[in-house]
């Protein structure tokens, strides 16, 4: 039955049939009780915004869903949203800007890259102070050294690049330093959304979401499905459990 369904979808939608199948297969989890944001996020179709070729970036729909939730919550309780501000302190290719522009809210984008696509460059999350406050801070750090950014994706190697930490303990210490700094930059009633994943390094499993610092009230735990990963087209003989989720 599934093989026949796949044939029908491919005949109707061509190369996009897998994306259509993924969207249909996850819809029952993505939408419940009239809500567009549930504890399961899945965006097989990435959407427009940022640079899809920038390794490790997330779908702008992730940021948009979190932003929409925060705006809806403020409006429900009769709070003003005219000065709502979204801050992304590791903005990469500028994905968060696309989400902010969609909802016509102010966005602040920082990045260690001296020449980012948008926002303030050469901003060091370990040493520089956050120059403003925000209602929503979306923090999507490197997953340790899975993808090294400085000297690879941009510029030259930087000693304060979290993707170039010597080991996981060093990475976690610096990650938690950033979390503390960003939490203190929140406005009253603000939210810090952290998107992280799990990884295997030299055969050992590391869970960032389990190890990172938690500050304030823990509002929700969201599981996000991963799609269109570089490793999707590889096969491995050794038995292991593939990592196909991230967490916010």
Feature map (PLM): residue ranges:
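Class I S-adenosyl-L-methionine-dependent methyltransferase catalytic core
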Residues: 1-248
